[in-house]
Amino acid sequence: FNRXSPGLQGVSSVPLRTYADQPIDADVTVIGSGPGGYVAAIKAAQLGFKTVCIEKNETLGGTCLNVGCIPSKALLNNSHYYHLAHGKDFASRGIELSEVRLNLEKMMEQKSSAVKALTGGIAHLFKQNKVVHVNGFGNITGKNQVTATKADGSSQVIGTKNILIATGSEVTPFPGITIDEDTIVSSTGALSLKKVPEKLVVIGAGVIGVELGSVWQRLGAEVTAVEFLGHVGGIGIDMEISKKFQRILQKQGFKFKLNPKVPGATKRSDGKIDVSVEAAPGGKAEVIPCDVLLVCIGRRPFTQNLGLEELGIELDPRGRIPVNTRFQTKIPNIYAIGDVVAGPMLAHKAEDEGIICVEGMAGGAVHIDYNCVPSVIYTHPEVAWVGKSEEQLKEEGIEYKVGKFPFAANSRAKTNADTDGMVKILGQKSTDRVLGAHILGPGAGEMVNEAALALEYGASCEDIARVCHAHPTLSEAFR
C-alpha cells in the first residue's frame, strides 16, 4: 500500500469504531472486506480519505481469508506432507517411518489458526490506518448514503461522498441438489469435514474442484470428479497443459468423468448419496455412490439486496455490475470492483482493482492489464499461467512460436525427485514478444510471477533467456 498520488499526503484522523448509533460521515464507504474491499479501504485512508468499511460477517477478509484461498492452501500443504510421509515417497529418500497417523482435528486447528491470524491482521491494519469498521449488511439507500443493518436488526447510517461495492461472490447453486454442508457440501463445507470420506464425488473439475479433491484424495478418500466441460483445470488453462495435468492427477489416484451432465443426486436411507451421471458421447449413464458430494460448479456475483435496482443500476446477463475503465457505475460516485464486475474471480485481481480504483478517486491514473493477471491451481504439481493460451492465439489469428522445457531435464527437479511437468512459453513470431506462459510443475505458482513481470514490461523471449538465473533452481526451466 505504498503508492501515493501527488498532493495527497497524510491519513484520515477518523477514530476506529466497530459500531455506532450516530450517523457517520465519510469520503469513501467500502461495502465488503474481502481482498478487494479491505485493500481499497486501507489505500483510501492512506490517501487521506475518511474511510468506512462495512462487513456483514463477524470476521474481516471475505471468502478468500475465511472459507477460500487461505484455508484451502493450509489443507493442501498439510495433506501433501501427509501424502509424502504415508506413501512410498519418504522411504525412497531413505526416510523410514514406522507409523504415520492422521490427526484430522489437529490439521483443521492449524488451518483455523492461520485464518484467525490473517483476519486479525486486517483488523490491526484498519486500526493502524484509521479505517472505521462497521459490522452489518450494507445497503445503498441513496446516492450518498449507505445503511448497515446488524444481525440484531439495529442499523447504522453512513453519509458518504463515494461508495465502493466490493461484495465478492457466492457459491453457484446446483439445480436439483440442495447443499447442507454436511454430506452435500460446497467448497465451504469441504474445508471443514469431520472425517475423511471413503468416497467423494466432485461435480466440477475446475480450479476449486481439483484442489479440494486433491486434499481428500491424499488423506485417503477415493475421489471421482465429473466435469461437463470436457477438460480439467477450468476456463483459461492451455489444453496441452490440461491433458498432461489430468494424466498426472490420474496417476495419483484421482478419477475423472469428462463431458457428462449430472441431472441430480439422491440421499439414501443409509446416509450415502447416489449421484446420477448422464451418458457422455460414446459412454453410458451411471449412478455413482459416495459418502460426500462436493458441488464445485463455480461462483456468482453477490449483488442481491444492495439497493442497486432502486438506484437504476442494472446488472449484466451474468449478474455482474457494469462499470467503466475507472470502475464507475452509471452513477459516477458509486464504484464496483472484484468478483461483482467482469473478469476472472481472483483475489489478486480484486486487490489490484481496489487500489487502482481509489487512486482514481484521488485523481490518479487508472490502468490495469487483465492479460497480466496470473492464475494458479495449488495442487501438486501446481499449474500456473498468465497471458494467452495457444487456443486463444489461434482464435485471434496471431502467429506465434512455442518454447518448452520439461522439469525432467531440470537439475533441481531431479535432485528433488519431483520432475512431473514442463514450462511452456508462447512468443510472437514477428517480434519475439512474450504472449503467454504456462507452467505445470513444482513451484509453478511462484514462477508464474516472473512471467507476469515479463508480460507487464513487454519483454521478449530473448530478454528472459539473457537474464542469469541461479543454478540449480527450478526457475531455470523458465529461461
Curated annotation (Swiss-Prot):
Expressed in testis (at protein level). The active site is at H471. It is found in: Mitochondrion matrix; Nucleus; Cell projection, Cilium, Flagellum; Cytoplasmic vesicle, Secretory vesicle, Acrosome. Keywords: Acetylation, Cell projection, Cilium, Cytoplasmic vesicle, Disulfide bond, FAD, Flagellum, Flavoprotein, Mitochondrion, NAD, Nucleus, Oxidoreductase, Phosphoprotein, Redox-active center, Transit peptide. NAD(+) binds at G204, A205, G206, V207, I208, G209, V210, E211, E227, V262, G298. GO terms for molecular function: dihydrolipoyl dehydrogenase (NADH) activity; flavin adenine dinucleotide binding. The modification N6-succinyllysine is found at K50, K88, K106, K116, K127, K143, K150, K257, K261, K394, K414. Its cofactor is FAD. Disulfide bonds join C64-C69. Pfam families: Pyr_redox_2 (PF07992), Pyr_redox_dim (PF02852). The modification N6-acetyllysine is found at K50, K88, K106, K116, K127, K330, K394, K401, K404. The keyword NAD applies. The active site is a redox-active disulfide bond. Homodimer. Part of the multimeric pyruvate dehydrogenase complex that contains multiple copies of pyruvate dehydrogenase (subunits PDHA (PDHA1 or PDHA2) and PDHB, E1), dihydrolipoamide acetyltransferase (DLAT, E2) and lipoamide dehydrogenase (DLD, E3). These subunits are bound to an inner core composed of about 48 DLAT and 12 PDHX molecules (by non covalent bonds). The 2-oxoglutarate dehydrogenase complex is composed of OGDH (2-oxoglutarate dehydrogenase; E1), DLST (dihydrolipoamide succinyltransferase; E2) and DLD (dihydrolipoamide dehydrogenase; E3). Belongs to the class-I pyridine nucleotide-disulfide oxidoreductase family. This is Dihydrolipoyl dehydrogenase, mitochondrial. It comes from Mesocricetus auratus. The lineage of its organism: Eukaryota, Metazoa, Chordata, Craniata, Vertebrata. The gene is DLD.
